[in-house]
Amino acid sequence: MSSAIASRRYAVALLEVAVEGNFLEKVTEDLQKIQEVLSGSHELVLALKSPLINVDLKSKILEEIFRNKVDEKTMVFIKLLAHKKRAALLAGVISEFNALIDERNGVINADVKSAIKLSDEQAKELVNSLSVRTGKKIRAKMRLDENLIGGVTVKIGDTIIDGSISHQLEMLRHSLVAQPA
């Protein structure tokens, strides 16, 4: 089984248990803390992936790091991952869990690129427009891309909305080349 599929299955199971047990908010907070630690410690990620470190030691490492920092139920889950030889999946499980939470809350991520920095008002207007268009809450990541010349591009999942001047010029070039002389 691929690691992505396994990560998704563990994330779904954790979400279901957390909802049924009424501790979803706490688990979500705990996983955020764990994700921050994993992002800041390449050595920990390597240790969790290492086949040279046995299951018990991985479990002890996780327990030492997260004891008194995460809820007991979350600790049971991460130790379960270690004992099932799936500690290397922890970051992937957290990522999948966050995606499931977003899906549950009707939130989608949008990657917005613009030629110049958008004002707060422009960014808010764009996010509102995307929200109306998709019927979902938008979490936008704004970035500059000077190659655009002007305008914006928005990527939501597999959909790209290209309102850039460079795209408009490319389309104009194609239409001019396609016309018979």
From Swiss-Prot:
Gene3D superfamilies assigned to the protein according to its UniProt record, in alphabetical order: N-terminal domain of the delta subunit of the F1F0-ATP synthase (1.10.520.20)
Xref: InterPro entries: ATP_synth_OSCP/delta_N_sf, ATPase_OSCP/dsu
Membrane topology field: Peripheral membrane protein
Subcellular localization(s) per the UniProt record: Cell inner membrane
Keywords carried by this UniProt record: ATP synthesis, Cell inner membrane, Cell membrane, CF(1), Hydrogen ion transport, Ion transport, Membrane, Transport
One annotated GO molecular function: proton-transporting ATP synthase activity, rotational mechanism
Family annotation (Pfam families): OSCP
Cellular component, GO annotation: plasma membrane; proton-transporting ATP synthase complex
Recorded family membership: Belongs to the ATPase delta chain family.
Complex formation: F-type ATPases have 2 components, F(1) - the catalytic core - and F(0) - the membrane proton channel. F(1) has five subunits: alpha(3), beta(3), gamma(1), delta(1), epsilon(1). F(0) has three main subunits: a(1), b(2) and c(10-14). The alpha and beta chains form an alternating ring which encloses part of the gamma chain. F(1) is attached to F(0) by a central stalk formed by the gamma and epsilon chains, while a peripheral stalk is formed by the delta and b chains.
Protein name, UniProt field: ATP synthase subunit delta
Originating organism: Chlorobaculum tepidum (strain ATCC 49652 / DSM 12025 / NBRC 103806 / TLS)
Gene it is expressed from: atpH
